[in-house]
Amino acid sequence: MCIRDRLYVYQRKDIDGSPWVRVGAATDGRSDGWLPAAQVSDWKQSLVLKFTERSGRAPVMFLRQSAEVEKLLADPAAAKNVLAKAQKNREDNQQVLALEPTASAVPQNQFYLLPIFDSKESFDENGQPVQLLNVASIDPGSAAAKPATKAIAADAFRTAVVLVVDTTVSMQPYIDQVRDVVHELQTRIAERGELDSVSFGLVGFRNSIKKTPGLEYVAKTLISLDQGRDPQRFLDMARQVKASTVSSHSFNEDAFAGVMQAVDGMDWSGYGGRIILLVTDAGALRKNDPFAATQMNEAEVRQAALGKQIKIYALHLRTDAGKKTHAGAETQYRVLTADANPQIGDLYTSVPGGDVHKLGERVDEIGTVFANLVHQVRSDTPQPVPLLSSAPSLADKSAAVGYAMHMDFLGRKTASQAPQLVSAWTADRDLTNPALPAFQVCVMLTKLQLNDLQQSLKLIVDAARKTQTSPKDFFQEIASASAYMSRDPQALRKGGNLADGGLLGEYLEGLPYRSKSLNMTQDLWLSLSVAEQEDFIDELDSKIRLYETFHNDVANWVRFGDAEPGDALYRVPLSTLP
C-alpha cells in the first residue's frame, strides 16, 4: 500500500473485532468514510522530509531495519560498498529497499510525501549524533501532474546570473567593473555559440527614499534577464547606470530590498541555474530598522530565494570607509549565503580594501564556473560528483552549487520521482559521509494553519509593541487579545507559556525543535534586556513576512482528494518556525 492521501481521523471503533477509523480529507469534520485501521498509519506531528541538494552527498538509501542503518553509520566504507551494489542491481532489495535517483535529483520544487513515523538517536563513527528515521510510503500524492514549465520543456540547461549592486555614492568604479567583466564573459560565451544558455541581469539598490527622496529608488531592475541575453544590449544599458549623487542617511544600505527585487522581480523561468551576486561595501538594513523596505532578516531573505531555487553570493567590499561595519556585515552575509552542505558553508567572499580589480576577478571566477558548466552540459561532458576539501575555493564551491542545480534540472527534465516504498529506515545524514545532511525536516501545515500562525505572531508582536514601556503588561495584553481568537487566556494569566495558552497552535506542540516562542513565559520575558526583547520581536516580525512568501508560493501548495482550498498543504521548513 502507498500513501495516496493525508487524512484526518474523526472516530475510531471496533467492527467485528477489528479496529476501524472514520476519516476525511478536510479539517471541517466532513467524513469520507471508514477504513480498516491496519490500512492507515498514525502521523501525529505531520513531519516530512525533503531531500537536500546534491552538491556532493551520495544518493539516500532506504533500508529494512534501523539496525542495518546503524551498522552502516559506523562504517562509511561499508556504506559505499552497499550503495555501489544497490546501484548496480536495483532489483536486489534484500538490504536496500529503495534508492534515491542516482543520475538526477528529485526536483526541489516537486511535491512528494515522505512522512516521519518514528525516529531514534544514534551516533556516527566519530560519536556525532545522527537521527535514524522510519519513513513510510513516499508518493507525490493525488495532485494532477503539472504542465511542463519552460525549464522542464527546454532541452538545454540554461543559467541566469543576476548582479544585485549597491548604486550609492561611492560605487561607480565597481558598477563599471561589473559591467566590463560581464561583457568579457559574454564575449567568451559568444565565441562558443552559447549566448542562448547564459543570461545576465542587473538590479540596483540604495536606501530609503522616504528618508532621502533624492536617492530616486530603493531597489530597481536595471537590466532584465531577457534584455541581458544580448551582450551589446547589456553593455549599452549598463553604461547608463550611474551611482547616486546624493548620500544615504546611513552607511548600511537596503541590500535585502535589492535581493528581494531580484528574487520576485526577475523572470527566472526557463533557467536551471539561478544565481544572485550581491555586490556592496556596506551592511544591510535589518528588520529592526524603520527604513528597511522588506522588514525581513537575512535568514528569511535566504529562505525566500531558496523557495525559487536561487543561490545568493555576497561579494563584500571591505573598504576603509566601512571599517566599523565590516564585522557586522560579514556576519549578516554569511547567514544570507549559508548553504545546507557544511562543506560549502556559505557563499560569502570578502574583497580586501575594496580592490576594484579583485572584485572583477571574483565576478569572473564565479561567472566562468557557471559558463563552463553550461558548456560541459551542452557538449555532453560527464559531470564528476564534487569532492570538496576542508577549505574549498570559491570556484570549488561554485562547481558544487552548479552540479546540484544541474542534477535538479535533470530531475525535472526526466520527471524523477522519490522512490515508492511502504516502510523503511534511513538516516538524516549521508551514510557514506555522515558530515553531510541528507534531508531537511519540514512540518506540513494547511493554508488555514499557516494563516492562523501568522495571525498569532502578529498578535504577539502587536502586544509587545503596545507594552514597550511596561513590559510586565505584555502577557496580560496577549491574554486579552487571545480571547478574541478562541484561545485560553486563563492559561497565560496563571503563569503558563505561550504554548499553554494555545496561542501558537497545537500543531506546533511536540515538534522536535527548541522554540523560543512556545516556551516564553512572563518571568522569562521580564528577565530579558530591552535589546533582547526587541530582537525577539524583530525575529517574529521577520517570520510574518516570510510566511507571506510561503502563502504566495502557489506552485508548492498541494491539495489531496476533495480538500477545500484552506486545507491545501505546504512543507514549512522546521527551521523557519517561531
Each language-model region and where it sits:
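Solvent-exposed loop/turn segments at secondary-structure junctions
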Residues: L7, I15, D28-G29, S41-D42, ...
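Von Willebrand factor
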Residues: D155-L277, A284, L315, R318, G322-K323
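P/S/T/G-enriched low-complexity
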Residues: Q303-L306, I310, L317-P578
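Loop/turn elements at helix/coil->beta-strand transitions in domains of secreted/extracellular proteins
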Residues: T159, L195-G201, A243, W268-I276, ...
